């Protein structure tokens, strides 16, 4: 149990730091669509697609690696709560078009990149 807790804790820290760096670097570029949050969710969607397939095909890996990557790192990197606030801020200000655009970008983009990540992992991990 101790190693599981440490794996999640460390992974979440790294994921949160990456999210913070992305926000610092990208959010000011287009304030209507905070690109740092979008990048966090899209990158996270792609990486979790890879991770799910990789862990499913590598059953011998210690469970702490899955906890580190999926529960910790992806949990720290991706952010539904920030996304929700950004969408609702537009809606409350009467900017319904922006609210819909931000919501659609995150949802469609994340689903697309998760599928692409799964496809990538299957291609990489396919028997030669």
From Swiss-Prot:
Catalytic reaction(s) noted: fluoride(in) = fluoride(out)
Source domain of life: Bacteria
GO cellular component: plasma membrane
Entry keyword Ion transport: yes
Ranges annotated as spanning the membrane: 5-25, 35-55, 67-87, 96-116
Regulation: Na(+) is not transported, but it plays an essential structural role and its presence is essential for fluoride channel function.
Secretion signal, residue range per the UniProt entry: none
Chain positions recorded as Na(+) binding sites: 75, 78
Molecular-function annotations in GO: fluoride channel activity; metal ion binding
Topology versus the membrane: Multi-pass membrane protein
GO BP, sorted A to Z: cellular detoxification of fluoride
Entries under Pfam families matching the protein: CRCB
Compartment list: Cell inner membrane
UniProt KW keywords: Cell inner membrane, Cell membrane, Ion channel, Ion transport, Membrane, Metal-binding, Sodium, Transmembrane, Transmembrane helix, Transport
Function in brief: Fluoride-specific ion channel. Important for reducing fluoride concentration in the cell, thus reducing its toxicity.
PANTHER family found in the cross-reference section: FLUORIDE EXPORT PROTEIN 1-RELATED
Family: Belongs to the fluoride channel Fluc/FEX (TC 1.A.43) family.
Protein name: Fluoride-specific ion channel FluC
Organism in which the protein naturally occurs: Burkholderia mallei (strain ATCC 23344)
Gene: fluC
């Amino acid at each position: 149990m101790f190693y599981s807790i440490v794996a999640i804790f460390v992974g979440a820290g790294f994921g949160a730091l990456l999210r913070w760096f992305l926000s610092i670097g990208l959010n000011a570029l287009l304030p209507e669509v905070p690109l740092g949050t979008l990048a966090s969710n899209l990158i996270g969607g792609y990486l979790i697609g890879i991770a799910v397939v990789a862990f499913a095909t590598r059953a011998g890996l210690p469970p702490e690696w899955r906890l580190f990557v999926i529960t910790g790192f992806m949990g720290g990197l991706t952010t539904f709560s920030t996304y929700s606030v950004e969408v609702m801020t537009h809606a409350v200000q009467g900017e319904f078009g922006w609210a819909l655009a931000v919501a659609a970008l995150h949802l469609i983009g994340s689903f697309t990149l998760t599928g692409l990540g799964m496809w990538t992992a299957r291609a990489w991990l396919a028997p030669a």
